[in-house]
Amino acid sequence: MSQITEEQVKHVALLSKLEFSENEVKSFTVTFGKIIDMVEMLDEVDTDGVPFTMNVADNLNFMREDVAEKGLDREKLMAAVPEKEDGFIKVPAMLSDGGDA
């Protein structure tokens, strides 16, 4: 099994601004290790003679002419919001510690 450490799980949680109990950290450590083991199994697949494909759906890039369209009326929008501050819509804080997200 891949060696994913609890410290690595805690580090990813910190970067993701998530908090886990010690039991959750242990569980995620085992689960992530199993996932990485399954992905590493792909290295063993013999792909000789299999043509390279970038997009199996065979879609093409569909381009259209870029046309400017009238947006929302700012005054009507601002009149409809419950809270505003300095000309912006004020929403509840998402990060409890005021982080850099």
UniProtKB/Swiss-Prot annotation:
GO biological process: glutaminyl-tRNAGln biosynthesis via transamidation; regulation of translational fidelity; translation
Catalytic reaction list: L-glutamyl-tRNA(Gln) + L-glutamine + ATP + H2O = L-glutaminyl-tRNA(Gln) + L-glutamate + ADP + phosphate + H(+); L-aspartyl-tRNA(Asn) + L-glutamine + ATP + H2O = L-asparaginyl-tRNA(Asn) + L-glutamate + ADP + phosphate + 2 H(+)
One Pfam family named in its UniProt record: GatC
Catalytic activity, EC: 6.3.5.-
InterPro entries assigned to the protein according to its UniProt record, in alphabetical order: Asp/Glu-ADT_sf_sub_c, GatC
KW NADP (keyword) present: no
GO terms of molecular function: asparaginyl-tRNA synthase (glutamine-hydrolyzing) activity; ATP binding; glutaminyl-tRNA synthase (glutamine-hydrolyzing) activity
UniProt KW keywords: ATP-binding, Ligase, Nucleotide-binding, Protein biosynthesis
Top-level class of the enzyme under EC nomenclature: ligase
Keyword Thylakoid annotated: no
Assigned protein family: Belongs to the GatC family.
Described purpose of this protein according to its UniProt entry: Allows the formation of correctly charged Asn-tRNA(Asn) or Gln-tRNA(Gln) through the transamidation of misacylated Asp-tRNA(Asn) or Glu-tRNA(Gln) in organisms which lack either or both of asparaginyl-tRNA or glutaminyl-tRNA synthetases. The reaction takes place in the presence of glutamine and ATP through an activated phospho-Asp-tRNA(Asn) or phospho-Glu-tRNA(Gln).
Subunit structure: Heterotrimer of A, B and C subunits.
Record's protein name: Aspartyl/glutamyl-tRNA(Asn/Gln) amidotransferase subunit C
Species whose genome carries this gene: Lactococcus lactis subsp. cremoris (strain MG1363)
